[in-house]
Amino acid sequence: MNTSTFNLDHCIEKLQKCEILPESTIKEITDKMKELLISESNVQEIRSPVTVVGDVHGQFYDVLEIFKIGGQCPDTNYLFLGDYVDRGYHSVETISLLTCLKLRYPSRITLLRGNHESRQITQVYGFYGECMRKYGNPTVWKYFTEMFDYLSVAAIIDEAIYCVHGGLSPSALSIDQIKVLDRFQEVPNEGALSDILWSDPDPDREGFVESQRGAGYSYGKDVTLRFLQNNKMQHIIRAHQLCMDGYQTLFDNKLSTVWSAPNYCNRCGNMASIVEVNEKLERYFNTYAAAPQSLSNKPTLDTNKELPDYFL
């Protein structure tokens, strides 16, 4: 690695000012990131205390707010549950910063894959267009979407709390099955890899029912409790769904949804949260509103377009 062109501390400092990195540097950091991620398992083992972060969707100034509230990396151990890009105005800066932080402090930050870490989805919901506007070509989008194929898909805190972007799959009811999935690919339209990134809990259903999102399933309390029992887990923390209060708990407090993008799409008026998990595995939801810069920042995307139903 040529340190004269690639200095992580310099990159992080630049990104914290919301300045994009050169295309050549993006290639270097994504190549290094793939080298790092290939050594990580599908299901990462994490020790408490750890702060868990849900969807951030390119809301860069709110990501900076997360580090102010939760503590800077590496002082705080972080687990991000995916959906770093699309919809927000600064997806490039957001994923660039998180990638650089992962490279700089690999044991203090874990990045999981969300359903938006996908070529197909990012071509529709903003990241591709943002890369084209900011770089004039799709090369940076290609670098990052290739890197997305390497991200882990789940994590376990202290062998007790299962963490994933979306949830459960009828095709992978044991964590051992998730450990052997081939994750090094574009998110498929169906199957276990797709399901765990796309599925949602539903308190009004039992079992698995095909999701109205067009991918994944709605899953009920019964299969959730069975999954926990069979895998000797105590709780599930997941993201993927907008929560007006920033979080939601379901199924006798056995499942939590954490949402970390306040005032989503600059119009939803919702709160956001991060989950602090201590050594006793107690969960504290730290809620926050949109950062002032996010409220005043001029959009680079057309947020007047209709949001797809699955998004809200």
UniProtKB/Swiss-Prot annotation:
GO biological process per UniProt: asymmetric protein localization to old mitotic spindle pole body
InterPro entries to which the protein is assigned, alphabetical: Calcineurin-like_PHP_ApaH, Metallo-depent_PP-like, PPA2-like, Ser/Thr-sp_prot-phosphatase
Co-factor binding comment: Binds 2 manganese ions per subunit.
Cofactor(s) essential for the protein: Mn(2+)
UniProt keyword list: Cell membrane, Hydrolase, Manganese, Membrane, Metal-binding, Methylation, Protein phosphatase
GO molecular function: metal ion binding; protein serine/threonine phosphatase activity
Subunit-level organization: Component of the Sca1 complex composed of at least gefA, gefH, scaA, phr, and the protein phosphatase 2A subunits pppA and pho2B.
Listed name of the protein: Protein phosphatase 2A catalytic subunit B
Species: Dictyostelium discoideum (Social amoeba)
